[in-house]
Amino acid sequence: MEAPAQLLFLLLLWLPDTTGEIVLTQSPATLSLSPGERATLSCRASQSVSSYLAWYQQKPGQAPRLLIYDASNRATGIPARFSGSGPGTDFTLTISSLEPEDFAVYYCQQRSNWH
């Protein structure tokens, strides 16, 4: 069995909103997976954020890259293996079959609206 290439680290983010503090909790904290496997990452909001949820990927020394916006829409140039679901309080980012370049940090972000 091939050893996992790397770990996916997730962050816990607190983001203010006009209605008060919204806490986004990502799980699991880490995933140990190999290329070709399926990755499922969860983000739970302490109150409904409708569909205003985005997923980002970040690699060392690079700026965050937008993957998914409005819960389920892929950003320009993002491969179809990335998909998102929502809305409400429970969101999921799925990578259907991991490629070596997918091993990175992933995090979710809530915004009250998009500008």
From Swiss-Prot:
Mention one GO biological process in which this protein takes part, according to its record: immune response
Q: Where is this region: Complementarity-determining-1?
A: 44-54
Its name, as the record gives it, is Immunoglobulin kappa variable 3D-11
Q: Which cysteines are joined by disulfide bonds?
A: C43-C108
A Gene Ontology term for the protein's cellular component: immunoglobulin complex
Entry keyword annotation includes rRNA processing: no
> How does this protein assemble?
Immunoglobulins are composed of two identical heavy chains and two identical light chains; disulfide-linked.
Pfam family, any one = V-set
Q: Where is the Ig-like domain?
A: 21-115
Region annotated Framework-3, chain positions: 77-108
Region (Framework-1), start-end ranges: 21-43
Q: Where is this region: Framework-2?
A: 55-69
Source organism superkingdom: Eukaryota
Q: Which gene encodes it?
A: IGKV3D-11
Report the subcellular localization.
Secreted; Cell membrane
Q: Which UniProt keywords apply?
A: Adaptive immunity, Cell membrane, Disulfide bond, Immunity, Immunoglobulin, Immunoglobulin domain, Membrane, Secreted, Signal
Q: Where is the signal peptide?
A: 1-20
Q: What does this protein do?
A: V region of the variable domain of immunoglobulin light chains that participates in the antigen recognition. Immunoglobulins, also known as antibodies, are membrane-bound or secreted glycoproteins produced by B lymphocytes. In the recognition phase of humoral immunity, the membrane-bound immunoglobulins serve as receptors which, upon binding of a specific antigen, trigger the clonal expansion and differentiation of B lymphocytes into immunoglobulins-secreting plasma cells.
Region of interest: Complementarity-determining-2: 70-76
Q: Where is this region: Complementarity-determining-3?
A: 109-115
Entry keyword annotation includes Transcription: no
